[in-house]
Amino acid sequence: MAKTSMKAREAKRAQLVAKYAEKRLALKAIISSPATSEEDRWDAVLKLQALPRDSSAARQRNRCNQTGRPHGFLRKFGLSRIKLREATMRGEVPGLRKASW
């Protein structure tokens, strides 16, 4: 089970990403636009760098909803491979069962 502080850190990152998403998108549009002058582009780059580091979506880590485990995470179910197997064996995942051939 992941430490509570790690889960809280990820929650804080998710909150920051949501808060600054529009601002980051606008600045990136200015930077990538060929019609933007070099001076405006440079100002946008500096403003983007001034934003909090954790407001970037690339710094988020997918974690298991039950345990907080960062590895072996399956997006479709929101669980780690271990918890998904346990839930499947209990019959809690509709349409999923142990393979047999």
UniProtKB/Swiss-Prot annotation:
Q: Which GO terms describe its molecular function?
A: rRNA binding; structural constituent of ribosome
Per the record, the domain of life is Bacteria
Plastid among keywords: no
Q: Name one GO biological process term.
A: translation
Keywords annotated in UniProt: Ribonucleoprotein, Ribosomal protein, RNA-binding, rRNA-binding
The annotated subunit structure for this chain is: Part of the 30S ribosomal subunit. Contacts proteins S3 and S10.
Name of the protein in question: Small ribosomal subunit protein uS14
In the UniProt record, what gene is named as encoding this protein? Answer: rpsN
